[in-house]
């Protein structure tokens, strides 16, 4: 009777599901089955207050078998590379709808391996740029078209609400945030020392 299953690698990933799960629990009679590989996942505390949220812990060694034997209507994950490495689609049910939830608003082509979303049926996109990228990659790689659903990025909405709810504090001394990318020739590799010396 596990119609809807979410899988989380650890407690840090709940934030990507939070808004969706809360909406489902508040507006439907669907039970959310939440599988986590973190025995200390926050979901165990949340489930104490929410009877339709059913958390389960599964260790890494049993995860592969669980995924191969998955029997659900819908499986939602933030883990890219379904089918590409150790996590496979169910061998038991071929009609499961697998949904990928993005970790951020950036370019999926820059942040994920080639083919990382190819074996998902549906991808929740944060905006039209991700939709365009995915469609272009499907065309270039001749892969099946996925259902693309523009859902925004609720985590950013929550951060904005939290910021706007606080009193504005103006620092007398300006603060500079340096946020390098992961790409080759990023600011840390190319000019960090010169930048710091000038400050």
Predicted features and spans:
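Non-catalytic membrane-proximal stalk/linker segments that position and tether the catalytic domains
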Residues: 1-2
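Active-site and donor-binding regions of nucleotide-sugar-utilizing enzymes
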Residues: 5-161
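Conserved catalytic-core segment of nucleotide-activated headgroup transferases in glycan assembly
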Residues: 13-29, 154-199
